Amino acid sequence: MDVKRVKQILSSSSRIDVTYEGVPVWIESCDEQKGSAQVYDVSNPGESVHVDVTALEEK
């Protein structure tokens, strides 16, 4: 995935399934300059991690 698509997903009112290393995640924010996103595991929303947007996959 790229930064442009991450920003589209963030601004969308639709539910778009995204995974990180095969785990379903919600995207919380995107850092365009760093090319990273803050995501959290759908099953464990209390923990978020920063990941490279290229590691995210749209399902």
Curated annotation (Swiss-Prot):
GO-annotated cellular components: endospore-forming forespore
Induction: Expressed only in the forespore compartment of sporulating cells.
Record keywords, A-Z: Sporulation
Biological processes, Gene Ontology terms: asexual sporulation; sporulation resulting in formation of a cellular spore
Keyword rRNA processing on entry: no
Places the protein is found: Spore core
Pfam family for this entry, one: SspH
Primary localization class, coarse: other
InterPro entries: SASP_SspH
Family of this protein: Belongs to the SspH family.
Protein name per the record: Small, acid-soluble spore protein H 1
Species for this entry: Bacillus cereus (strain ATCC 14579 / DSM 31 / CCUG 7414 / JCM 2152 / NBRC 15305 / NCIMB 9373 / NCTC 2599 / NRRL B-3711)
Originating gene: sspH1
